[in-house]
């Protein structure tokens, strides 16, 4: 079974996807982290001037795909964790992900991971583009101010004000929704949930019965 969770940044996709995967004992794939891995690698001095085709053909990054384990990202065989949450990497990932060759490359990897077993995929175009026939599609929304407050918890203290981050998120939403290639849209047949005033437990209470009915 494939479950997709789409939506803009800060809506709780990662937290929900992890909790849902744990509840169902499914694999979990954070596709945003995959794009940020590419962005991080591309920002390194040794790779900034390398032609995109060569960068993707002999990448300095890699991912581990294994059953019953979250996807792990590596740069030159070194695990990546905190490097992927910087605002610089996030902003560049939003730009870099618009490249058709980058999206095609990533979608191939994501579909390969889906072949490993049942999985919860979170991102921005999982249900609309990559897995349009997923058994369950969820689209999360939330008020921009609440999303900014959540995102600030992941950033170094003092790196951005809540007001500045709110403005960045709104601008990114517009860019994601208006891009020509695979824009951020609500997938057909998706369950839309506003997470502004809901805990992850409350969201799980809404969706787990639906998923069990699809599994029956």
Curated annotation (Swiss-Prot):
Principal EC category: transferase
CDD domains from the UniProt entry: CMPK
Localization annotation: Cytoplasm
Transferase is among the record's keywords: yes
Residues engaged in binding ATP: 7-15
Signal peptide as annotated in the record: none
Single GO term (MF): ATP binding
Subcellular location, principal: cytoplasm
Stated family: Belongs to the cytidylate kinase family. Type 1 subfamily.
Record's protein name: Cytidylate kinase
Protein encoded by which gene: cmk
